[in-house]
Amino acid sequence: MASVAAVLILQLALFPVPLGVWVQGLILGLLGSLMAVGLGLTYRLNKVVNFSQGDLGTAPAVLAVGLIGFSSVNYFLGLATGLVAAVLLTAAVEILVVRRFRRSPRLILTVVTIGLSQFLVVIALLIPRIWGQTPISTAVVNFPWHFTWHIAPVVFNSNDLVAVIVSIGCLVAVSLWFTKTDIGIAVQAAGDRRDRASMLGIPVGRLQSVTWVVAGVLSFVTIFFQAAILGLPLDPTFGLTALVTALAALALGNFTELPVIAASAVVLGVLQQGVAWNDPADPALALAVLAAVVFGAIVVRQLLASRRDREVEATLSLAGSVRDLPAAARDLTEVKVAKPTGAAVAFAAACTLPLWMGQGELIRASALVALAVVGCSIVVLTGWSGQVSLGQMSFAAVGGVMGAVALIDWHWDLSLAFLLAGATAAVVAVVVGLPTLRLDGMFAAVTTLAFALAASGYLLVPAEFSWIPQGQLGTPYLFGASITSQASTFELSLGVLVLVLAALQGLRHSRIGRVLRALPANQRAASGYGVRIVWAKLTAFAISGFIAGLAGVLLLLATQSYQETSYLASASLVVFTATAVGGLSSSLGAVLGAAVVEGSVVYLPPSWQLFPAALGVIIVLILFPRGLAGLCYDLRDWAVGALARRHGAAPVSPAVAS
């Protein structure tokens, strides 16, 4: 409980509040503890962070709130309907989606939960249309029997008391279920030794269903009773913000210690209220404070971690990354001609786009190319080295800010702006990755997501810091040549993408590339061959950050000014899932994912824009675990195999993990 005491001391020392505000934070923290405990339960069993935890209860809560607020349904009937909906929805998600990946690498299941999160956000955004309402925050949900009391300076009512009673009741019930019942004890055993539990006849699949349903119900209870106190502001970042608070509690509780996780969530609620009370004009500051708490907790875990905790399990690697063709196949004349010819045709076709696209379409095309570059950075960090990053757009934002400083304030040449942006983003990426270097690559997902929310909400917002330029770019120059049109901006973006792809191709075949790709599969074996694991991970973060920084400058050029809305945390998740759809282990996957997912988003209304990435990542990973690029490589191997047979050569093996 030392971490809980540390957060409480931080709040009392830096963000003191009156008693009433402190009690209000305690109430909200109790509700938040339910979501954090649900997150801890699924992590305990599956050893993955369930990024859909914040959204599992959102859609049922929106349904219940709509029934009560718009259809005048009885409060208890609406609550019961939402509760049943939460059970059915979570059970369906676990049986139809999660269970299909029970034997998949943990990285794949993590990507699936991100896709589920986005899919559930779309559902929650569409439910209010049943009543012709948008947004749902106009609905009012109050406990039927109303009374108030006052603890200066806050007036509490029956909704607050009900929230306290329900929260404590749920925590006690989960504690008794987890420690006293046969199912709860079996969940503990399966979480500690899943394979051994299966061998002993424990129905792990059924336990997983029960655990996920419990987590979904806890998520629903959190959001429904918060709606009565704070309302239900529904947007794509709503679940993310709640999730980061739960992640902070999870980190403070060492990811598996449920009592500490619950207590941490309570004191984090008090801390958030303290930050909001001391700086009411700047609510986004709470995100930065939460990010700092996450970083501190991960650093402490790294210092205290045992050797076993520090070893990355092989299941974090991808199932079957891309392998080059055998030398005999590469020597075939058709293969020698096809590869450069195909690349040249694709590049030439892309270069013709400015001839038939309008200005608005060219802006979108330039942004799409920039996002493909961000996808390439994800390939290096996640696809190759196994460090899950959910904050790549925040590194791109660093590049965008430094590019704006170089171009607007200092009037530098674009070449120097690219170098400054890439170098700065590389340094920031290394700093963000430092707390997780000796831990499982899954922990990088927590720190990068926390940084993404803090950066997009506070750290890199011009309204918060006056040194961030807000003006228009004007006419940038590259080696003295002016970039005066959207067509030239697109051509520059395309050129940068080609250079990045060529650099990654060379890097992949270098010693550094081979070392990075060996990290997820067997860290101990790599260390035995003289690989310095920490330095290899630092290299991955630096290279990835540099590439993302370049993409930030490209986005800056496309929009002609630094706009923090281009680098939101939700955009980081969309880019990550787009790359997963394309194929995390291949730079081709980054391009395909950006083209298919990001390209389709352009033509959809706002409430549907998360749908392609959400549905795409689930369907593609079920049918093609290596993404669209993996499908392309399978077709390549089939075609080359047919050619080899015609020439009487040995058949080509399918692309497998290297």
Roles of regions detected by a PLM:
Residues 48-51, 169, 193:
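Glycine-rich phosphate-binding loops of nucleotide-dependent enzymes
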Residues 38-46, 91-100, 249-253, 377-381, ...:
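C-terminal ends of transmembrane helices
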Residues 21-32, 36, 54:
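N-terminal transmembrane alpha-helices
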Residues 96, 197-202, 207-282, 288-289, ...:
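Ordered, small/hydrophobic-rich secondary-structure cores
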Residues 40-49, 220-237, 251, 549-564:
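Non-cytoplasmic
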Residues 32-41, 61, 83-95, 371-377, ...:
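Central hydrophobic cores of alpha-helical transmembrane segments in multi-pass inner-membrane proteins
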Residues 16, 28, 54-57, 77, ...:
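Transmembrane alpha-helices and adjacent helix-loop boundaries
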